[in-house]
Amino acid sequence: VLENNADLGFAVDPDADRLAVVDEKGRPLGEEYTLVLSVDGYINTLGVESDIFVSNLSTSIALDKFALKNNCKVERSAVGEINVVNKMNKLDSNLGGEGNGGVILRECHLGRDSLVAVTMVLNRAAQSTSPLSEIYNSLPQFEIVKDKVNVDGIKIDDFFKSK
């Protein structure tokens, strides 16, 4: 991005279902914000006054706070693309995704797609004369730590009984 004096940059994973975005300063925005930027552009384009978006439980609350500010709501699903899609179908939601950079737009198809996400982020960027870093900074700022905890040897049923 910096070498080419680009306004923004994109990186996709090997099977192209997730997208990471880089601003004009060469700063990765974090894949959590791919979905937030997509929802921002979606709301602006369609003039949505209230809608339901779906994300999984492993997604930061930045999307929830942004949606609430725009009279919209976020419903959560279990982790996994199929769980997000099933919840979208149940709620008749048009847009969902995961905090891993995966965006799902019903209008295109019910699966994560980095090209859909690229289009939606470019749409959001085109709605403003501000650089992407300023658009990003205007969004609710939250971080999420994703880690695994080893529970070998712990009997989960017994653990919850004692609490």
Where do the PLM segments sit?
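Short, acidic/small-residue loops that bind anionic groups at enzyme active sites
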Residues: 28-49, 78-80
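N-terminal small/polar loop signature for handling phosphorylated ligands or for N-terminal nucleophile
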Residues: 1-22
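Phosphate-binding and adjacent anionic-ligand microenvironments
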Residues: 45-163
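A generic local secondary-structure boundary/capping motif
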Residues: 8-9, 40, 85
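Anionic group-transfer/hydrolysis microenvironments
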Residues: 13-15, 25, 58, 100
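Short Gly/Thr/Asp-enriched flexible loops that form oxyanion-binding sites at enzyme active sites
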Residues: 17-36, 63-64
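Short glycine/threonine-rich catalytic loop with a Thr-x-Gly-x-Asp
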Residues: 12-14, 28-33, 109-112
